[in-house]
Amino acid sequence: MKLKAIPLLARTRHGHNDFPKIAIQPGLLQARHKVTSAKPKASSTLAVTSDIARKLDKTGVWKKTGGRKKVNAPRAIEPRRVNIISDGLCDDILKYIGPSIERHRGCDLVDLNPGAGLWSRKLHEVLQPRKHVMMDLDAELYSPFLGDLLLKKNVEMMPKSGLVWKDLLEMIRTKLSDQHETTQDATPIRNDTLLVTANLSMCPKKSFLGFDSISSMVLYQFMSSIRTSTLFQRYGLVRMLIWVNDEDKRRLLPRAINRRKRSAFEAELSCEWIHEVAGQETEVQDRNALRDEWINTESACHTLQRMKAAGLVMPPGRESLVYSKLQSEPELWGQKLAGVRPPSLTRPFKLELEDLEQELPGSSETSKRLKALRQREKYEQEDALTYLELLQERDAATSLATSAPAKFDKANAAWNERIDNLKKNTRNEFNGFKDSNHLFRQAPPVLLWDRRAYEPLPARADEFFPNAPTALLDIQPKAMHPLFRQHGPSSSRAGDMSEVMLRFWFHHTLLPIHKAMEGLWGGFGDLITECPSVRDPSRGGTPMTGNGALTVRAMNGEQWAEILQAWMDWPFRPTYTQMLGRLVEEAEADADDEDTKSGATGLAF
């Protein structure tokens, strides 16, 4: 399949029977059981819970009725739009992150898809912007909701779509006269005089140009603009407050290593932070993307400590389960938990076992099931003890690498032999614990989720209309490594090359780094010696070999920069066109790409 440039894309600019209960059932896990076990009830997505929702409902835009609508009935050009309709949610959010956005007071505010405008009005009141430019293709439909806001002299509505790049670029060119573009060679700095907010949440979602929704595509392109200094990012590092469908937040902000795809890695390269300010409180979607519950607990404890230091508390009535649970368990705060206690996963059978153990003796079938589940729990506990031993042996061996090389070689070989003797599924599960622990133990942790400044505020589906679970992401770009900023034919194209290489890289996440390098192009694997951070524990590497070698999925941004530099310095590297032709075809042939689907990877090459 040939790549086609997407019309909307901006152009490049320059868990033993006597096993301690706490060891397999962390407090955080106990709290989660109540969430993960809940089955969603079938209900309409048009529940009315506020005056704004009632007015929206009366328009009839979201009601599916047979026959033709009345001639004068309100119509929507974008009828899939999800509106924020909860005053309480908006007030809680702005109070929660208020100190953080105070630096934008008096800024230029760009507001895409404001809809009924509740969020827009609240944000305007807090920021008192110099200029507030709104873009909404359904401006006529929503004008009765925005009347008082539109009367302000510093507020302007453009009845065009902020998701169509032609219209967006026109707005940027004509309405942001007080902003100044950064030069191509300059290191971009934070621009607090411009703030972008957008509502990309849709219900129902509809695939578009290979993406699972147009909002997924726009979010993808907003992130790309950071790397290429296009759109708003041409004016410096511009913060973005983006409303997205709740399920889309994990693309940029995964909570487990096997959800860390290319888009999440590139976000780590280009963003100082991505915070989930508010979102649906559930872990159901993570059952296939699990990690040690002790990592989750320790990560949450660290977050609560950061919140305490910053004077942050969750608003009354909007405390999350995690926040409430750990507030009552201060003995866990400040402790090293992961890698010290036997690892545990949130498995559905554990809740079933807990329920059966609380019931009175029943039928023989129930007794057989209970016996089987207890046996499974026993095996899992035994495996957990083995995993803990292996993690600790690995750490002990690593500590010998510099001080006692001979002892390290012996310990490394013995450890690898133990791994080789594990059954395949057991080995695979251990590797997941190993790599997750490796990412978490770096300073700071590699996943942006583990660096969060606060716990997300729980947001209910009925605080939106239609009632679609929606999340607010706070995205703050950072100055990337100079190599990653090289885009376009007038540059070294290192940034372009990085993007193409990562498409191959993240289809082979279980490979050791040196094998992945060799897979990029024959002979490149020999340059592993030019990438010392891969084997340096102080920089997120490991001296372990074989089963203990650093894998692609456990790589950090600094290591990728080193690998890219080695590539750019390699006299035998292929041209950009050769790489594009070979590696994009390989990436497209693999259907397991959550970043984009089908031919949607089409960049404006």
PLM features: residue spans?
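C-terminal target-recognition/interaction regions appended to catalytic cores
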Residues: 38-68, 460-471, 475-605
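Catalytic cores of RNA-modifying enzymes
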Residues: 5-486
